[in-house]
Amino acid sequence: MTIRENLEFPLKRNLKIFDQQKLNDLVVTALQEVGLEASINKKPAELSGGMKKRIGIARTLILKPKIMLYDEPTAGLDPVTSAEINELILEMRNKYNTSSIIITHDISCARTTSDRIIALFGGVNKMEGTFTELQATKDEELIKFFNY
């Protein structure tokens, strides 16, 4: 399956769009949004980890959701690529006026992309607030995790 086919899939399945010109326009626009229009005919195995993350974002954005769910968006990425993905998340959130739910163990990602953070440990909500509020916590588990 090429990147084009990967991005066409939710359009065909969820939105029932089958007109090839419309599909092409939507796919090209989504890939331009994430800076990967040149990868349209590549296969996923030909992409770097950061490129795959961008394709995942494009595949979701193509459906114009009100809420974006990111599950470990920077996992396995180097610091530079992680920062680029964080910036892309913010850019897309602002451009499309979407809310984001970000599940992450990456403190930099949480600090950069989040207005509010819920810190869960063992399925228990240990704290909720801004990153600054979390930094001020006296909770030993949070301090150990955030390593301040």
Q: Model-flagged regions — what are they?
A:
Residues 20-39:
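Conserved ABC ATPase "signature" region
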Residues 43-47, 51:
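Conserved ABC ATPase signature
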Residues 68-71:
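Catalytic Walker B motif of ABC-type/P-loop ATPase nucleotide-binding domains
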